[in-house]
């Protein structure tokens, strides 16, 4: 036990002696305290350091002379710019320096003047100047003149019109003038107040006049009605099943833009009153509807918009088969109370003997049809010798918003009494429907037919 305790105090003494010798040999200056003398639990309040207190002489805040200062690496007297250098201005420059300065100034003054003149006469934008030529640009500011912008030529080119269409429109206008000149003043006034004036074409093998405007207009569309035709003078009728889908081709073939070599007969379309349609005096039209205006027959660049379809449409399968004839465009009447002379062959209910050429006579007054909406068509003057009777188209509305149509052979009546007797004695037409028939006012029938015709016209234009 004693042998183990003895070397410890001796070792401590040796370590202390060695540290004292090192302290004596070390140069005078700050030194770090030995680790055994530092106490980490102490903290100086002045320097916020650990290992000593404020009273300790090792605090750097008390002994500044003992603080560590970085040693200087060398002298820097010649490298620091303590006195800034001033530009040296020569008071008396030599003759060589004067010549060089004049030669440099002359091209600098000529360059901006030349560029300013080029900018005035040529109109080109000036080039970007270098930053070292600021003085020369200031002297040439007075030479710069604001130039006008180049004029913009806006030439409106007129659309090219086909010469054939122009010739056709000229002949049609001349034909209209001759027809108007031959009529009486009363008929002229009625024709001028009509809704449309369109050319009509006489088709070989079909006795029907088909007015067709060149440009479709807004407002109520025309009504499509089937008209019977006769192929011979013996009174024989050609029966062909008719469908609503076939009207597109006929409408496109009859349009005035199509090149047709057959002779064209221009006849005016007079205004149609409510009694001419046979729909009754209670036929009402929309208050916002406008009468269509006649447009010239020329090439149109702006196509009209597709009209909106109403809630009621006549499907193609609802129209029954009948005699295929020419289609007529029946314009809506301009006023319900207008009682003027009607000169339209398709509006009046007449026999072939009552239809002359141009000088037509007003038709007889007709009563309203109570239950069935019927449209009776007259014949063309070419078929006036056959003695055939006109046909009556009967439309009936079903419950599922569908319509059924049928053709009835009706004799010609010259008085309203005979017409009433025939309607009372005529049997009802058998209908191919799925439900019972509902009585509908005439104005609903007219609006539904009008919507269906407008949809068919729009589809044919798109195709």
Curated annotation (Swiss-Prot):
Compositionally skewed regions (Basic and acidic residues) per UniProt: 74-83, 97-114, 159-170
Compositional bias ranges of the Low complexity kind: 180-198
Residue span of region Disordered: 1-42, 67-115, 150-295, 326-365
Pfam families, per the entry: zf-CCHC_6
Domain of life: Eukaryota
InterPro entries per record: FAM90, Znf-CCHC_6
Family designation: Belongs to the FAM90 family.
Name the UniProt record assigns to this protein: Putative protein FAM90A2P
Upper lineage: Eukaryota, Metazoa, Chordata, Craniata, Vertebrata
């Amino acid at each position: 036990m004693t042998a183990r305790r003895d070397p410890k105090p001796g070792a401590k003494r040796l370590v202390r002696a060695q540290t004292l010798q090192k302290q004596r040999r070390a140069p005078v200056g700050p030194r770090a305290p030995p680790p055994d003398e530092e106490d980490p639990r102490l903290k100086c309040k002045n320097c916020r350091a650990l290992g000593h207190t404020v009273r300790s002489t090792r605090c750097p805040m008390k002994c500044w002379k003992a603080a560590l200062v970085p040693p200087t690496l060398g002298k820097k007297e010649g490298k620091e710019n303590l006195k800034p250098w001033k530009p040296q201005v020569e008071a008396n420059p030599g003759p060589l320096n004067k010549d060089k300065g004049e030669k440099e100034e002359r091209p600098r003054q000529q360059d901006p003047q030349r560029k300013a003149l080029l900018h005035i006469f040529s109109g080109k934008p000036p080039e970007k100047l270098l930053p070292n030529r600021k003085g020369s640009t200031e002297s040439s500011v007075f030479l710069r003149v604001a130039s006008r912008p180049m004029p913009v030529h806006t030439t409106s080119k007129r659309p090219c019109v086909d010469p054939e269409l122009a010739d056709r429109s000229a002949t049609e206008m001349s034909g209209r003038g001759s027809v108007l000149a031959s009529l009486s003043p009363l008929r002229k006034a009625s024709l001028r107040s009509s809704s449309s004036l369109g050319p009509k074409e006489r088709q070989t093998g079909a006795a029907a006049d088909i007015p067709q405007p060149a440009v479709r207009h807004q407002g109520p569309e025309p009504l499509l009605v089937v008209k019977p035709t006769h192929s011979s003078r013996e009174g024989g009728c050609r029966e062909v099943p008719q469908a609503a889908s076939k009207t597109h081709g006929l409408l496109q073939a009859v349009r005035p833009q199509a090149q047709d070599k057959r002779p064209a007969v221009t006849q005016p379309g007079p205004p149609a009153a409510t009694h001419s349609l046979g729909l009754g005096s209670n036929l009402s039209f929309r208050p916002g509807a406008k009468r269509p205006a006649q447009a010239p027959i020329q090439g149109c660049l702006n196509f009209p918009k597709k009209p909106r379809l109403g809630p009621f449409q006549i499907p193609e399968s609802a129209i029954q088969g009948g005699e295929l004839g020419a289609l007529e465009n029946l314009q809506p009447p301009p006023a319900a109370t207008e009682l003027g002379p009607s000169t339209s062959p398709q509006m009046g209910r007449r026999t072939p003997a009552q239809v002359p050429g141009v000088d037509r006579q007003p038709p007889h007054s007709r009563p309203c049809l109570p239950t069935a909406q019927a449209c009776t068509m007259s014949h063309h003057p070419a078929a006036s010798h056959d003695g055939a009777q006109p046909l009556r188209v009967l439309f009936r509305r079903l419950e599922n918003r569908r319509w059924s149509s049928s053709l009835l052979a009706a004799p010609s009546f010259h008085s309203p009494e005979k017409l009433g007797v025939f309607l009372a004695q005529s049997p009802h037409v058998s209908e191919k429907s799925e439900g019972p028939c509902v009585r509908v006012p005439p104005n609903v029938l007219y609006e539904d037919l009008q919507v269906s015709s407008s949809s068919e016209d729009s589809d044919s234009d798109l195709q």
